[in-house]
Amino acid sequence: MDGPHLAIAASDAPKIGVMAGPGTGKTKYGLMRRVARLLSEGVRGNRILLISFTRVAAADLRDKVAELDVPGAEDVRATTLHAYCLSLLMRDSVLALTGRHPRILMNHERDLMLRDVGGDFGSIHDRRRRVEALLAGWARRTADHPGVAVDDDDRVFEREVLRWLLFHRAMLIGEVVPIAHRYLSTNPAAEELEALDHLVVDEYQDLNALEQDLLEVLSTHASTLCVAGDDDQSIYSVRYANPSGIRAFVSRDDVEPHGIVVCGRSPANIIEMANSLIEHAVDRDKPALVPLEADRQGDVSIVQWTDVPSEIDGIVSAIADDVGRREVEPGDILVLTNWRRIGERIRARLDDLDIPVRSYFTEEELASDDGREAVALLRLVVKANDLPAMRVLLGLGEASGRSGAYRRLLSHCLDSSLDPLDALRRMAAGERLAGLKVPALLERYERAENRVQHLRTLDLPNLVDELLPPDSDDLANLRGIALDSLEAAEAAVDVLDDIVSAVTQDDVPQNPNFVRVMSLHKSKGLTANSVYVVGSVAGILPTITSTHQAEAEAAAEEGRRLFYVALTRAVHSLVISASAAMDLADANARGVKYDKSTIRRSGDRFTVRTITSPYIAELGPSAPRGERGNSWLASRAST
């Protein structure tokens, strides 16, 4: 590709802004050509930094850099912004100087913290939203001043969260950006500000306002800052991503703008459907995507099943037919759903059929108490004073994590300058601590300590067998990771590191030999010949949890962008699947709205009527007419 791609590569402008739609080749043919040109002109690789938000996008950048046949390419760093900030803070001892510890909380550990802080901060959902605002530097809107909490409740919340984290010698991964921003903004002599000549940023629309400002700070002394993105693909409002940031950057007077609209990935009819969909976005004023091959048509189906079990059966049958009779490689199949449960059931069914498959849902290995307990025990085997791990064990088996009792323990410890582990240890030895009674916590502490002491006597293979027994379905994935780790592990800490890395990073490969099942969010940056979008019903796509009109409207807008991303993953075939009914319990758990008059009894369960996602009606004349699932399966069998 030439034209805008070549112009991006050749530009010597100090600031370059690229607005590029999905599948337009901006990364491979624009940004990578730019890096290759800089290297060929003598720029040292370690003076070039490539940044993206997601690990998938960063891994894609690393792969493409590795393909450059230019001296110095091996020294170019391609990473996520969070990974870069963490390494910067560790290297410059900023964390140590500020008394912070790089013990990163997992999601379930973070939720325990949010329950423990107390206060009138609403439900756990409200608290998650508030902590994301904290991690975004309180930049909930682009007009907010990054890094500053203005609201009194926000200030109190921030103080309580930081006190918990300091007391537990832990931090949230999202903290590294605000800390790095504060450090670099207030230390103009920092070496990092002189370390870069060229900064290239991909997927800029996924960053929040604080992160976007941090990149401006990082590029203070750089020769060039090249930013690429697409506001139509901004899908991270949960962490206050700023889609208007890319529009504002490209329109600045000091920025050389470029646009790419020709899509070489998807067939013309799928591109037309995607264009029709995104044209319904509020206040959108952009040119439509243009197919590279106007006469290339994809195989598109929109199907509806009688209920969710029928949908799972049908999709599994279709994939089995793809892999078997049609000889489609499993790695060419991508299954996307906003409903984790249906995705996990599809994965399990494919696995039963011996079809290679992996799912990629956030920390899914730790969805059960058994998984959380196993990892917490392993952490304590490795490090006896891992307080967040003990906090997990103290709260297991109770919906609130025994947060009331734990708050009493924390309050006593703060007043007495005691470590919670020391307090529990002293009470277990028979000492009475004035005014403190937490029998449930003490019982679980003693049980945990006994198990940890026993586990420390075992060699690595037996340690894995006891923590992750082979007969547990809930622990099967964790056990698989641990067994793989045993091949090279020399100590328990090696197994723990491999488990934590696999569970929290969970990098999705671009070219695997297995079917990939994941959320629509996780699909960003991926491409597949065959894409199945499953569970496409109102209430799931979009998922709207807020009762506030403005927030609900924003969620609906982002849901459309999310569906747009999903459609444009497809290279050859696309199946959009929905059901006409789901279990009442599932509808309530997911917050799906339904008419009570549609509740029906089906055996020992109740179902409610569902309708297809409202976005399906926005796909335009290029979309095929919907059909019943069974009829669709029958028609596939005859072709």
Residue ranges, per PLM feature:
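Conserved helicase core region in the C-terminal RecA-like lobe
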Residues: 78-87, 199-203, 228, 339, ...
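Helicase P-loop NTPase motor core
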Residues: 17-30, 34, 254-256, 262-356, ...
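C-terminal accessory regions
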Residues: 410, 414, 537-639
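Accessory N-terminal region flanking or inserted into the helicase ATPase core
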Residues: 1-30, 47-49, 115-203, 209-217, ...
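Conserved helicase motor core of SF1/SF2 NTP-dependent helicases
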Residues: 22-24, 205-279, 287-293, 539-542, ...
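ATPase/helicase motor core of nucleic-acid motors
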Residues: 252, 296-298, 327-456, 462-466
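P-loop NTPase Walker
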Residues: 1-97, 272-275, 568
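Accessory C-terminal helicase-associated subdomains
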Residues: 423-522, 526-530, 540-544, 624, ...
